[in-house]
């Protein structure tokens, strides 16, 4: 009987929580986001929780953008750009200066850490910081979720099975979130960020409920037309070729939009060449057409994916290109911009998206 008891009795072994969270050195902050323990790429500094930029983008809010070359953090709002410099308590919302009572952005080498308080200003999330070990529980998934109540004081184990080490103790009436169901065990998340297993018989009142919080999401508007858009490319290679617009319009029946190839990226500093024509725009408007001028990253000074990356990965270079583009648009009365970039590598994708965001704000 003693042998059987030893074989089948629950283990009292405690799991190494630093190992569980992946903590390898002092000062690291473990992170649980919704139902996932992620790499401990956080830290506590001056009493504030900071999360590494890569974790923020991947798990919390992908709209944050860090430029390590120019040491600036950006966040795009519908009509404004938020910018933060390293080590500062101040930040800009377009031209308006605002301040917090903590340093918003810290760096270690080229790695950026963003204050969780600042992240939460722009993210529909809740979080709580706990000790022993230092960890943060972040909830950002809202809507329907399955929960249950702990029936009696018990343990959350690392894996399903009574011989698996204990992660945490839970008390009668505690509520846990159900992550997965197995035959005799359920994978659960505790309110303080442990994800492990509890026996089915130790749970009761399983139910699906809707969780939410008060948060005013930013409204990103768009433009739509009440007609079918029929657009023609107009390959314009020099200023003289702009004179062929009337012939182009006459040859194309049912057009609503024409896209002349007027703008070409000149170099990796964000300068551009333009052959835009106000007369061309006037002729098109008289014919009832909108002009959506194209900007290209080819047939100009950019000749490779690497050069497009050099251009778009620097915030000042994107800004230079956007300012020149908007200036030309306003000068000749263009109705829209057609971005025709074809030298975008996978590594450049995040920078290209940021370019489009910044361009949309200026538009």
What do the predicted segments below correspond to?
Residues 153-155, 194, 199-246:
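Boundary/entry segment of secreted carbohydrate-active catalytic domains
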Residues 168, 180, 186, 195-198, ...:
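Conserved glycine-centered beta-strand/turn positions repeated across beta-sheet architectures
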Residues 226-235, 264-363:
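Chitinase-like catalytic core of GlcNAc-active glycosidases
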Residues 51, 55, 114, 118, ...:
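Extracytoplasmic/secreted proteins, especially bacterial periplasmic and envelope-associated proteins
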Residues 36, 78-80, 89, 143, ...:
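Solvent-exposed coil/turn segments that connect beta secondary-structure elements
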């Amino acid at each position: 009987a003693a042998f059987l008891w030893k074989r089948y009795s629950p283990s009292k072994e405690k799991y190494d929580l630093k190992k569980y969270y992946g903590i390898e050195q002092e000062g690291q902050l473990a992170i649980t986001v919704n139902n996932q323990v992620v790499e401990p790429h956080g830290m506590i500094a001056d009493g504030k929780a900071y999360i590494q930029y890569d974790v923020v983008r991947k798990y919390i809010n992908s709209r944050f953008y860090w430029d390590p070359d120019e040491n600036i953090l950006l966040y795009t709002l519908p009509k404004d750009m938020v910018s933060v410099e390293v080590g500062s308590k101040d930040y800009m919302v377009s031209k308006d200066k605002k301040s917090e009572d903590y340093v918003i952005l810290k760096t270690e080498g080229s790695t950026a850490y963003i204050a969780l308080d600042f992240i939460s200003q722009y993210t529909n999330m809740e979080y709580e910081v706990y000790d022993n070990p230092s960890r943060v529980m972040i909830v950002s998934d809202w809507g329907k979720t399955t929960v249950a109540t702990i029936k009696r004081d018990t343990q959350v184990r690392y894996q399903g099975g009574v011989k698996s080490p204990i992660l945490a103790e839970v008390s009668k009436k505690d509520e846990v979130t159900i992550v997965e169901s197995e035959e005799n065990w359920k994978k659960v998340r505790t309110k303080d960020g442990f994800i492990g297993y509890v026996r089915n018989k130790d749970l009761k009142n399983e139910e699906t409920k809707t969780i939410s919080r008060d948060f005013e999401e930013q409204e990103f508007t768009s433009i739509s037309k009440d007609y079918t858009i029929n657009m023609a490319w107009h390959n314009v290679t020099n200023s003289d070729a702009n004179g062929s617009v009337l012939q182009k319009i006459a040859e194309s029946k049912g057009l609503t939009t024409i896209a002349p190839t007027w703008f070409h990226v000149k170099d990796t500093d964000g300068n551009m060449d333009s052959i835009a024509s106000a007369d061309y725009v006037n002729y098109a408007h008289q014919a009832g057409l909108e002009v959506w001028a194209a900007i290209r990253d080819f047939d100009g000074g950019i000749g490779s994916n690497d050069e497009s990356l050099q251009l778009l990965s620097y915030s000042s270079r994107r800004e230079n290109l956007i300012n020149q583009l908007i200036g030309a648009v306003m000068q000749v009365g263009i109705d829209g911009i057609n971005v025709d970039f074809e030298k975008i590598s996978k590594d450049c994708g995040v920078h290209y998206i940021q370019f489009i965001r910044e361009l949309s704000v200026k538009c």
